[in-house]
Each structure stands twice: as structure tokens, then as C-alpha cells.
Amino acid sequence: MPAKLSVNLNAIAMLRNRRDLPWPDVAHFGQIALSAGASGLTVHPRPDQRHIRFSDLPVLRALIDDRFPGAEFNIEGYPTEDFLVLCEKTQPEQVTLVPDDPSQATSDHGWDFRKHAVFLKDVVGRLKAGGMRVSLFADGDGEREPVELAAETGAARIELYTGPYGGCFDDTQKADLLVEKLGQTADHAAALGLAVNAGHDLTVANLPKLMKRIPNLAEVSIGHGLTADAMEYGMAETVRRFCQACGQRNS
């Protein structure tokens, strides 16, 4: 089964924010991505708004509602009160909770579910009551207990942190080891009734191996590698390439 592609727009927003100018237009690139076959858009609004701005959210929400009603909006972030209120106002189809410190450059680890289980259960319950699906950022280390604890929060999905796998480059032996651990984690999730997303440093080159090991992968969220390719091939063609790497047939 093909995985859905959600295009992360943070890198586009970061480029825009280098100047006090309205371009590149985040919503315009979101429109191109969805028109080219992406199933959704992802943003990670940080407290300092260093890339995605809070004002981007209603614009992207309206884009999906008005032009692409079958697409999904995914908002990532650490669940502060301000973040939760932002989600409640925006009503994304999915909220992906990550354990980031506000100063982190990017998400680089999953939740410690042993430590944060009670906290996450409360947050998940609040978001679900608001009609949002919740995914929890998780390390793909192959252990079962953390996945069991994630399932007990009431979340519908986990998102596998694929950074170490994405960073292997040409080290095939290491990549094989890491993708097997990711696969074991996904197997535990499936057995516990959790759907599985994945994200971080995924590329057209490394997606097929991941898809082969996790054929039930529901969604991948990709920003940096996709944006880098878009600088060479254009956004629309790049999205089509990533959709194909996800196992989708280009229309």
C-alpha cells in the first residue's frame, strides 16, 4: 500500500523569513505541492516563529478547505498551552506532538514515554475531544514497551523518527540495521492498533527501502530533502518523484 506524502513547508518559510518580503509564498508552494499529488501539508510553528509564522496557519487551513478538501493539515509541535490553543483554533486533521525544546534547530528524538505518559495522555485527550487525530513522535529503536505506553495515551498514530536512518548515506550495512529497528517498532505499533507515520531526512533514494520493510506505512512528512530537490527539479516535479518513491502511481 502506498504511503501518503505530507509536504513540510518549514524550509520554504525559513527562506521567506530571510527578508522582510512576502516571497517565497508558503501557501503558493503548498498549492503547488497539493496540485502535484501531495496528500497534505505539514508545519511546525515554533514559539519564536523563525520559519512558520502563526499567521500562516489560517491561510493554509483556508487553502486546504477551499481548494483541496480531501487533503490533510498536520501541525507539529511541543504541547505548550499556546500550541494547544493554536491547534484548537486551526483545527488540523492531525496534530503531531514532538518533545522539542523551543531552542532546538529541528526535532532530533522521540518522546520518553516512560517519563511523559501521564502528561501525554491528558494532552491527547484534549486534542481528541477537539476532533483532531494525534500522532506521537517516537524513536524507532525496536523496543516494544515505549510503543505500548504510546498506545495507552489514546493516540491514533506514532511518527517514527528516521533521522539516524536518513543520515546513513552510503553506509548500507548501518542503514539495513536501522531500517530493521524501525520496522520492528512499526510491527509493535501495528500489533497494538497504532497507525505509523515517519519523518526526518527521508529522500527519494532512501524511501523505497523503508517502504519495503514497513509496507503499511501510513504517511511520511518530508521537508528538507524535498525542498532541496525542488531547487533542482522544481516543486511540482519533486513532489511527483517523492509520491512515486512512496509507492504511488503518478496520475
From Swiss-Prot:
Pathway: Cofactor biosynthesis; pyridoxine 5'-phosphate biosynthesis; pyridoxine 5'-phosphate from D-erythrose 4-phosphate: step 5/5. It holds the Pfam family PdxJ. One of its GO terms (cellular component) is cytosol. The active site is at 44 (proton acceptor), 76 (proton acceptor), 200 (proton donor). Its EC number is 2.6.99.2. The keyword Lyase does not apply. Gene3D superfamilies: Aldolase class I (3.20.20.70). One of its GO terms (biological process) is pyridoxine biosynthetic process. GO terms for molecular function: pyridoxine 5'-phosphate synthase activity. Belongs to the PNP synthase family. Homooctamer; tetramer of dimers. PANTHER family: PYRIDOXINE 5'-PHOSPHATE SYNTHASE. This is Pyridoxine 5'-phosphate synthase. It comes from Agrobacterium fabrum (strain C58 / ATCC 33970) (Agrobacterium tumefaciens (strain C58)).
